[in-house]
Swiss-Prot record:
Involved in the binding of tRNA to the ribosomes. HAMAP family: Ribosomal_uS10. This is Small ribosomal subunit protein uS10. GO terms for biological process: translation.
């Protein structure tokens, strides 16, 4: 696989699970002889929701909730066939969204 890169983009709501999954991918890629660039932390997306505390009155009394989506980017440079096989067999934690681009 000469001259080809694998770009892996990870997303999760919990940054600890995201970091552990990133560590697993980096260790697997390095073990099979590929060069890894990253993990690069991408901007965290914060979605805020504002709702009334009471169902009927008190418009001024509100509560805010937020949902944070943490993201990481990995580049695997010149992957070997063993690297691709090892990454396909890798079992990551639930709650981590993985996008792979060749």
């Amino acid at each position: 696989m000469n001259g080809q890169n694998i770009r892996i983009r990870l997303k999760a709501f919990d940054h600890r699970i995201l970091d552990s999954s990133t560590r697993e991918i980096v260790n697997t890629a390095k073990r099979t002889g590929a060069q890894v660039r990253g993990p690069i932390p991408l901007p965290t997306r914060i979605e805020k929701f504002t709702v009334n505390r009471s169902p009927h009155v008190d418009k001024k009394s509100r509560e805010q909730f937020e949902m944070r989506t943490h993201k990481r980017l990995l580049d695997i440079v010149d992957p070997t066939p063993q690297t691709v096989d090892a990454l396909m067999k890798l079992d990551l934690a639930a709650g981590v969204d993985v996008e792979i681009k060749l």
